[in-house]
């Protein structure tokens, strides 16, 4: 086979030099035709769109052609010509074909519809489908948008540890990391497990958040962001939870809660616009196939300012809805940690646009959030989105050493684990704020997928760590 430089299909479909000899490589989606001519739909993953390969059967070995089945990988040299059919401007008239990889007849991705549940069972193959090709190209583009946004605003990308000795959320739902023999655990004089001989000499876990370390960096570099995997051992089998997911966590010195809200709104609008501008074909495919209102919803986020609403006012709206006959599964009262149904009511039915809820009761928020003067609420914020509920959680951080100490004691967090964090309040403390965005929550919104397991390549959930 003549050596010709490969052209990606995404680039080929934009070319206008009709008559050029080209090489394309990819996987066969379908093959159809007559006794004289076959048409192969070829895809290489660079785009949702296939290129049609026109094969004059008289010019090729019959035994080789039998190997070209759905899923097979082939290389084609041919002439780029104007397409006589609808759907795309160009196609390739094959001159040479090489089968790079045959596909066994047990290949599960034949030309028919497959349920999302079935595709999760073959997560190693599902990126080859149109749906997951689109989702994972969008995932890549969202990652690019995140780095681009913060870089353009002068933030520094800061790497926080995956293995940690602290629990940022105070939730205790952490995966432990140990090299100890689990069948012969050493106990101390109180009967508790002794970690003296463990690798780190202390109890260690996979991180639930890089926020605390990010705060340290912000008090030195001014503005930083983290973007990496986080882990939570929540035994939650829901369409909204993963045990392993990715978080984006900016921290900014000298920002108050209002600045934090401005940054969150600007950031998420930037990401949504990036998807519409740079993933148009993939977004349109998902809109047409899964969620007819997807594009309209994405455009709506860009059009309207987010509502900024104190928690207390939000509770009043929900209580009024109940009084008028609206049924919620979970009760509504001041002090409750709002359920997804409450958040979505505010966004989808009352305001019909994203909402930033602020000034939550301190009892339902983390120790590091700055207290308001009323002594009952903290300067927290949650960004609520249609179909998703909470997509961002953040706050102005408590900068006062004594107030932070008191809050740590109230929540019974071991002081020995917090000395390094408290040092930043002793040595040149400053106002600062930040937030966390679950990357997969953002992807749920941008792709229109209904289950968070379908926006990450290999979901980690209770009883599931395959691949």
UniProtKB/Swiss-Prot annotation:
Disulfide feature: none
EC id: 6.1.1.22
HAMAP family found in the cross-reference section: Asn_tRNA_synth (MF_00534)
GO MF annotations in UniProt: asparagine-tRNA ligase activity; ATP binding; nucleic acid binding
GO CC annotation, single: cytoplasm
Stored SUPFAM superfamilies: Class II aaRS and biotin synthetases, Nucleic acid-binding proteins
Gene3D superfamilies linked: Bira Bifunctional Protein, Domain 2, Nucleic acid-binding proteins
Family in the record: Belongs to the class-II aminoacyl-tRNA synthetase family.
Keywords, in A-Z order: Aminoacyl-tRNA synthetase, ATP-binding, Cytoplasm, Ligase, Nucleotide-binding, Protein biosynthesis
Keyword Transferase among UniProt keywords: no
Reaction(s) catalysed by this chain's protein: tRNA(Asn) + L-asparagine + ATP = L-asparaginyl-tRNA(Asn) + AMP + diphosphate + H(+)
Name the record gives this protein: Asparagine--tRNA ligase
Compartmental location: Cytoplasm
Gene Ontology BP, a term: asparaginyl-tRNA aminoacylation
A Pfam cross-reference name: tRNA_anti-codon
Quaternary structure and interacting proteins, as annotated: Homodimer.
Main EC class the enzyme belongs to: ligase
Name of the encoding gene: asnS
Keyword Ligase: yes
Native species: Bacteroides thetaiotaomicron (strain ATCC 29148 / DSM 2079 / JCM 5827 / CCUG 10774 / NCTC 10582 / VPI-5482 / E50)
